[in-house]
Amino acid sequence: MGQKVHPNGIRLGIVKPWNATWFANTNEFADNLDGDFKVRQFLTKELQKASLSRIVIERPAKSIRVTIHTARPGVVIGKKGEDVEKLRAAVAKIAGVPAQINIAEVRKPELDGQLVADSIASQLERRVMFRRAMKRAVQNAMRLGAKGIKVQVGGRLGGAEIARSEWYREGRVPLHTLRADIDYATSSAHTQYGVIGIKVWIFKGEILGGMPAANAVEPKGDKPKKQRKGRK
C-alpha cells in the first residue's frame, strides 16, 4: 500500500516538516488558512521564473513570516532588494498583518523533487522528447548523489491519440519505509495535445532519530527487551 498514500503526507512529523507552522483559535483558523492559500497562490504566480521549490509560512505574534526556497534567489530579491520589498508589501496586504520575507537558496536543484518536475514540464512545453527529458533528470539526480529516483509522465505522450503513462526508475525508492527521506512532487505541462502530468520521487537516504541511519547509535537499554522475551 506504499503507492496508495501521499509520500510526503505520511512522513509528516517523522522525517518531513510542515509547510505551515502556526496555531490559531477556532474563530481565526479559517481566516489564517484562507490567507495562507492566497499568499501561496500569489507567490507561485509572481515567481514563475524563479525556480520555486517550497513556501514555508509562520505566524508569530500577529504577523506573518514567509520563507521562500528557491534555486534562483537573485530573481526573487531583484536589484538592491526592490523586488523582495514589493513582495513583502503585497503579502502584508493579502494577509492583513505585517509581513517578513526570507529567502533560502536550494543548493542542488537536481535533487529537489519540485524543481525536477517543473524542469521536465518546461522541457515538454518546449517540445523536447519526453523520454529524453526523463532520462536527463534521472541521470543528473543520480550523478549528484541521490540514492534513487523515479520519474513518471502521463497523458498524450508524443501526440498519441490514446493517453498512457511511462516511468523510469534508477536506484532504490522505498515508499514503505517511513524513515526514508523521499522528496515527492508533481507538475503539469500544457502542450498543444493537452495536459501532461509529471510525478517525481527522489530518495535521498534514510533518517533515524534526526540523523542519517549510518551514523545512528543503537540504544543501550536492554531491560524492556528482556521483559518482552520473558512473556513469550
Swiss-Prot record:
SUPFAM superfamilies: Prokaryotic type KH domain (KH-domain type II), Ribosomal protein S3 C-terminal domain. PROSITE patterns: KH_TYPE_2, RIBOSOMAL_S3. GO terms for biological process: translation. InterPro entries: KH_dom, KH_dom-like_a/b, KH_dom_type_2, KH_sf_prok-type, Ribosomal_S3_C_sf, Ribosomal_uS3_bac-typ, Ribosomal_uS3_C, Ribosomal_uS3_CS. The lineage of its organism: Bacteria, Pseudomonadati, Pseudomonadota, Gammaproteobacteria, Vibrionales. Belongs to the universal ribosomal protein uS3 family. Disulfide bonds: none annotated. This is Small ribosomal subunit protein uS3.
